[in-house]
């Protein structure tokens, strides 16, 4: 169980460092997006963020799978990764189960997965919210420019 708690903390550390690096990259993209707000500018940013977050989750699942394989909890790495992905995402098909002595590690991975997936969802939501905010500001500016032509700005 101590190893599982260590893996949970390590997973959270990996996730935090990945999101901080992503945030650093992302904040450098905002001026360009704000200056020329178009879908062709937004889509690559969203896809890069999605891919980075997906990569973080895969790395965290690989960490847990490596632990299961290293400890002999599951027979093959492929099986370990499949079990890890199933537990991490809380799908839990049940076709592969850990032995009685490893059950708490599986539960800890599931709890870690729920928290990290939620953290990622919140991060992605904040990015999309910021894009909507930028779009709204742009529309307000455009409405203000056209108000002298008979349009009323809100």
Residue positions per predicted region:
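Juxtamembrane inter-helical linkers in multi-pass membrane proteins
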Residues: 29-39, 84-88, 138-144
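Short, highly charged, low-complexity non-transmembrane loops/tails of multi-pass membrane proteins
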Residues: 133-154
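Outer-pore turret/helix-boundary of cation channels
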Residues: 56-83
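Pore domain of cation channels
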Residues: 6-15, 79-136
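Interfacial helix-start motif at the membrane-water boundary
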Residues: 40-58
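Membrane-water interface of transmembrane alpha-helices
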Residues: 14-31
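Helix-boundary and loop/linker segments of multi-pass membrane transporters
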Residues: 36-43, 95-99
């Amino acid at each position: 169980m101590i190893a599982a708690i260590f893996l949970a903390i390590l997973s959270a550390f990996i996730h935090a460092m990945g999101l901080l690096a992503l945030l650093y990259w992302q904040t450098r993209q905002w001026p360009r997006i704000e200056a020329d707000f178009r879908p062709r500018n937004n889509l690559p940013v969203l896809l890069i963020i999605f891919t980075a977050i997906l990569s973080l989750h895969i790395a965290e699942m690989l960490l847990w799978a490596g632990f299961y394989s290293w400890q002999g909890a599951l027979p093959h790495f492929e099986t370990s990764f499949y079990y890890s992905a199933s537990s991490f995402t809380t799908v839990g098909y049940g076709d592969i189960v850990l032995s009685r002595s490893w059950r708490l590690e599986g539960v800890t991975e599931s709890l870690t997965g729920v928290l990290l997936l939620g953290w990622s969802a919140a991060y992605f939501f904040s990015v999309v919210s910021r894009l909507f905010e930028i779009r709204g500001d742009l529309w307000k500016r455009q409405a203000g420019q056209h108000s002298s032509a008979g349009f009323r700005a809100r």
